[in-house]
Amino acid sequence: MAWSNIGLCANSPNSFSELPSPENFSFDKFNNISLKLELVINQRATGHITEVERIGEQYFLQRQDLIAVGVTAKSLPGTEDRIDVSSIAGVNVRYLQSSLQLAIDVPPNWLPMQSLSAHDMGRFSPAKFGRGGLFNYNVFGVYENESQQKEVSIDHEIRAFSEFGVFSTTGIFKSNFHRDVQSQQSSQYTRFDTGYEYANQARRLRLEVGDYIVRPLSWSQPVRMAGIQLSHDFSMRPDVVTTPLPAFYGEVTAPTTLDLFINGFKTDSMAVGPGPFVINDIPMLSGAGEATVIATDAQGRQTVMTSPFFLSSDLLKTGFTSYSASIGALREEFGNASNEYGAGGVVVAMRHGMTDWLTLETQAEAKDDLVVAGLGFVSNAFNLGTVDASFRVSNFKDQSSSYALSYSYQSRLFSFAARTQVEQADFYTLSHLPNYEKLNKGEEASLKSRHVSQVNMGVRLGDWGSLSGGYFDIQQTDSSSRTLNLTYSYALPFDINMSLSYNHSIGGQAVTLAQFSLPFGSLGGSAGLTLKREDDGDVRGRVGYSRLAPIKGGWGINLAHDLNEDPENRKQADLTYRASWAQFRGGLNGTIGNYDYFAEMAGSVSTLDGKIFPANEVYDSFAVVSTSGFDGIPVKYENQIVGVTDEDGYLLVPWATAYYTAKYEIDPLTLPANAAFSTTEQFASIHAGYGYLLEFPIELQIALSMTVVDENHLVLPLGTFGRSETGLVSQIGWDGFTYFEGVDPGSYILFYPQGQSPCKVSIEGLYERESQKIQTLNSQVCLKTEDEAAL
């Protein structure tokens, strides 16, 4: 009946005529209308909804609305607040009725500059530290067959660290034995360095108290002192780009993906909105090269932009400054005496980036009767290379000076460097202290004038290998030497690497050297052959095989045998074993019947988190990975397996690089099935000289599965909610099956069947708390309960 009524209404000839006629109807009402639309600028939705007045094909909106979505104010014509955007030259407007948007395309240069960084900042994290100590040791013993002399040395480092800094001391103990003396012949302990260091990473400041090496400039000499040194050290922040990097400018008309290639290798990918952009901090190596940006828009259209560059790592960015200031006593007889110190001295050095193409350098050093001052600069010579120059003056006697000038250029295929340095006679600095002290005592120790020049050049020949050469000229008052060397390297078939060298001392002898090496890939190790020919025609050689001990532990070997006309060719053989707690090496070298023997043990003992960890030598920082007591868990450092955790769930990683944000991982596949963990990888950087504990929280969960039935032995309804005494929740599945997992399920579980009273399953005593497997319980009866406390 309802359908027939509708049909009757639709077919009635008078039905529509009886409807009220619209008054003043006109299509102009749709052409002249106020709309609420989202503005889309150059295909980028802005999320900005505003009132747009449409009059025919004209669209009016407020000037401020355009500025709010990124159009620069200076690009808009006129000064009126209300703008007809459809009438602006160079602007295209479309009304997108289905999405209630107004699409406005403007010239890209009307939009603000977008600054993008191609430098990876994601891996930086503030350096961390722990509280503990470290003892590095190296025990080395040698037996010389000919003299039958035995020598044992113990090299050590003791280090303690906390939030207050790092204290360390190093030294060596030596003891000699002779065949004609039954007791110890001689023993000596020599201290090397003892000092305290505190670093402030945020301010990039390093304070050193005790023994230290003055941080020199490229044209000055290092000096050992004992006192105080304060330095501004950029190495604490490897994420901070100190070198002026080229910027890449461009513009796009729509949202685009940019792919950055440096010398043909893809280094980064980033998204950019419409408008002009600049890519800052482009990562690259020193020298000349080419940066290419491929821009791909949403329709897949690509635009390629290329720009050459030249980069020098010796330059500082504009406004960047590094410095060091040192005061203390000059160290004498280092390595031979423990506590020999001379007169006091002061050294101050500074580098400052004046512009992105000019860095100024200065250094001054002084003691009671000696002052040395110098000034230098590093410059980018119009992207054609780097120029480095310096000049120093010493007030010794009638004053003497030194100057240096160098030029270098490097590209993918070619490199060139030239340097000359001249020192007048008796040019003294603090590094010449032993000679200076002898002069004060009336001894002959004058320094000769010295002129050193060198030229180095290299070229890559593509599939034909590479060629490099150098010329060295050293001229002194009473002697001189000039040396020329050439080296050609080429990759032969079967992965054999060949290197041919020619060294000629002009006016002296010439030596030709041929070297071949063959890596064995997955088999490990490599074989090598060296042939050496001298001017007299004598040809000598050496053949050998070497395999490093794996970083995660294992055996290494080194074998060598001389090849010459002498029947008693020298031989060498040593074996290395790397354990998780130390490294052992032993071997021999010499001729048959006259071998010298040696043995070495090197490692460390550290303390952190109240635990003691024997491990291999720690040269810088170290990390201790904790897996909450689970043993045998593989640990990776920078995607490489470095060992497994011990019986207490710890592994020491001894080669962490200070301030480098490294990735540490654990492999959870060997964990029990009911182990719960929140993460399997962490990123961390560690202060220089420190140890840090990286904890991976892991908990064993109790996993219970069961079938639940009611008092009539019927399975509980599908989807019935359940909650344990400790708050663990689950639901009833098919056939009454349910599963609970957690650290502690408690002693009972409450279930809430829909439309029925709650019921309770007692599980106390039915499971093992230490089990590492999923425990399947027998079918459990859920008993109705009215205990509100239990609910």
What is each residue range found by the language model?
Residues 3-242, 535-606, 614:
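Post-signal-peptide, soluble extracytosolic/periplasmic N-terminal scaffold domains
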Residues 30-37, 44-50, 629-640, 711-726:
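Short, ordered, surface-exposed loop/turn motifs in non-cytosolic proteins
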Residues 39, 250, 623-627, 702-711:
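A short, amphipathic beta-strand motif
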Residues 53-61, 282-288, 650-676, 688, ...:
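Short Pro-Gly-centered beta-turn/loop motif in secreted/extracellular proteins
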Residues 101-106, 311-318, 611, 680-700, ...:
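Extracellular beta-sheet/turn segments enriched in Thr/Pro/Gly and aliphatic residues
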Residues 125-128, 152-164, 184-201, 342-356, ...:
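Feature captures outer-membrane beta-barrel proteins of Gram-negative bacteria and organelles
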Residues 135-139, 169-171, 207-209, 323-327, ...:
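Membrane-embedded beta-strand positions of outer-membrane beta-barrel proteins
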Residues 640-649, 726-737:
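Short, acidic Ser/Thr/Gly-rich low-complexity loop/linker segments typical of extracellular
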